Amino acid sequence: MGKKANIKKIVRELIKEKEGKDKKDKRKIKKELIKGMWREEQVKEKDKKKEASHHPKKEKFKIKLSFNGKKIFGGALVAIMLSILITTGYLLFEKVFKPISIAKYLPSDRTIAFVEFNSNFNHNQLTKSFELLQDYPEYSEKKVQELLEQKLVGNYDADLKVWLGRNMGVVFMKGKSDGKILEKIYFAEAINKSNAKRFIENKKTYAKMEYAGYEIYAAETGENIAFIDSYLIYTKDKKTIENLLDFQNSENKSVFLSEKYSRISNNMPINKVAFLYVNFNEVSEAFLKKIPLLRNMDINFQQLMPLIKVLDSDGMALIAMNDKFAVQSFLTLNVDKVKEEKYINMKEKYSASITQYVSENALAFYGGQNIEGQIKRFIEILSSGKQSVVENFDKILQNYTQKYFGSEVIFNLDIMPLLKNEYALAIENEGGKPIYKFFLELSDKKKDIQILEKIANNFAKIGGVYKQEVIEHTLPDGTVSKEIVAVPEAIKKESEDYKGIKITGLKIGGESKGFFYAIIDNIAIISDSFNGIKNSIDLKENKSNLKVSDTFLKLITPVLKNSDEISYFNLAKLLPNLPLPISEISGGNNYFDDGIVSINYLHVK
């Protein structure tokens, strides 16, 4: 409006001026003036737009806030309803699709370990498992059901299927009054408790009685069965089941509510074939002696206990994948004992570059970064911050160093600096026999070669390798006595050139056996086979090695990207008589401040 008013005012003044100069009609004068004025205004507008395009100005906006009480209340109501829906959905999922863990009913201060097996034959984890093992009838669904029939004494379809739920297993606990006693509890989810009770009562070998508000089915043979929520509990003695029922009525913390179990459970997949939990703080000698692998070994369990206590707890899950099995574990360390230690967490990124010197048909490979840090980590865990333990361990290492390499070689000054970078151990096949190779990436090639030569020379000079010989002595009365003595083996140092690389051998006695080493690029290779060293030199040249093999691509690469160290074992070749359907295992470990995460892939033959 302001712009139009100004134009009209100017027009009136110009009309008066024009009328004075010439006697044109007032309407014509007005028409011409307005036409000219609008042209001028349009030109000015165009100029302003051009100027504005060169110097754009930011427009200021005033945001007017308005609050609508009804909308706010409605939004809050939606948020509340959504929270309720999510919570209800989670609880429904927990109840309907995922069985409650037995950990909820176990005392945290007495439970040593438990293992849970998925017993839902319609679950995709079990269907995948049976598909992977279809060539092994002894691991079929039918065989598993036959095993259940044998253990539970009943027909699967008629007696067990009508009540058996999705979870079953065994628990190991310390005795309530005597920690040296080992209590064993079997459990199975009863998806239909009425059918489960009918199954027990039909046996007519159990008498029903009351204890602590629970029904107990007791047999004359000492066996006892009780129900805790949806679980059937079975023990071979009355006191064990009574102790567990007493715990249900107490205010004591369960394993499920403990921090260590939560740390492990949160790192485990929801769907799995089986799950193992171990609380190392509660491990007893009685439990260790129950482990088949340790049962027949001459082990001083008292000396083993301090190391076990540092480990805190471990969880391990078996998962069936489309083409293999996976074992995922989370080993938690005792935070109070390792919180000040700086070597627990691995900082270096491991690439497994040493695999280019290893045969593509290797029987086994284990590699990582910074073995110096590994040793220090192990010492820190054992010592729990006690300097005296560290000093004693250093003395032990130095004593062994002096035994084989003499007093001139100092473990911390000469050997430890060689162990800072990448390392690997490999087992290869040579003429049907296994040979061993150890690899070290050198930091300072010139300096490190001198140290290796010093160690080799001292080993050749000192010996440290003995053989047993029988020496006869004639006594004064003419009696001949025999004595077994340890005689040092003669060690001969020899060198040979192969493709421009010097291979040094330390041959023991008159035989060809011994130790051989060479430096390829910046990698030191030590082996018990001369031909093994030559083979590693050839592998680097012809590019036919583990690094570029299908084995590396399919089995090692998947675990390498998230691992501080890796391992690979060809069980079919390494242990051909092993009665397992697994042909190869590849795995990796990832170190954190409070624990170690491991993933291992099990490949079916």
Kindly label every feature range from the protein language model:
Residues 1-60:
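N-terminal targeting leaders characterized by basic, low-complexity, disordered sequences
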Residues 62-216, 261-310, 326-435, 446-488, ...:
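Structural boundary/hinge residues at secondary-structure and domain interfaces
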Residues 122, 226-255, 318-348, 373:
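Hydrophobic, ordered structural segments
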Residues 167, 210-218, 314, 497-506:
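Short, hydrophobic/aromatic-rich segments at coil-to-beta transitions
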Residues 168-172, 223-228, 302, 306-322, ...:
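Broad, structure-driven detector of short, well-ordered beta-strand segments within folded domains
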Residues 190-195, 236-240, 442-446, 529-532:
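Helix N-cap motif at beta-to-alpha junctions
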Residues 218-290, 507-580:
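A conserved glycine-rich beta-strand in the N-terminal activation segment of trypsin-fold
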Residues 436-440:
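Ordered core of a single globular domain
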